[in-house]
Swiss-Prot record:
Homodecamer. Pentamer of dimers that assemble into a ring structure. HAMAP family: Peroxiredoxin. Substrate binds at residue 121. One of its GO terms (molecular function) is thioredoxin peroxidase activity. This is Peroxiredoxin 1. Belongs to the peroxiredoxin family. Prx6 subfamily.
Amino acid sequence: MVKLYSKFPDVQVLTTKGPIDFYKDIFGKGKWLFLFAHPADFTPVCTTEFVAFSQKYEEFKKLGVELVGLSVDSIYSHIQWLMDIEQRYGVKVPFPVIADPDKKLARMLDALDEASGQTIRIVVLASPDGIIRFVAQYPMEFGRNIDELLRITKAAIVNYKAKVVLPANWQPGQDVIVPPPAIFDEAEMRIKLPNAKAWYLLFKKYEELPPDQKV
């Protein structure tokens, strides 16, 4: 699987919204990339995921995040499937879907099941500098939790902007954690602070973050 903190591939792709150059059209505009691959068009689990992602599209957009789908199906298969989703479920898919029939991008992302020839159900989140900040892989048999992926995206953005870390089960608005010091004297001083549970665990109120570091 593609590695955390590695560079997202610098490639151009064909999508249902036209060609996309990741570094020009997304990262070059200061946006985050949330790429999710699905095994195949016209399949039950993937259909429910596309409906769910579409329903959360505006929330991702407000965060400055571009949702982009991916599979090895053809562009014509994608178009017909998106039409089918709109006709059957009343949901218009607002984000681009990459057609990767030659499997080039799928292989670059280690997102191809060579045995079946299908794309693996993965998620890749990359910051505006093109660095991959989150990667996850899911079984073919069940769908992703979009609310949890939205929470992870928000946590990644706060971490990236504010240089803080986030505790277990963190939700926007809750306390964040200041990274621990690597110098002994600073560690001794840290333990004396009111919000310090230990020298390595210092909480900070979310509202103390500057507005441009919040989500």
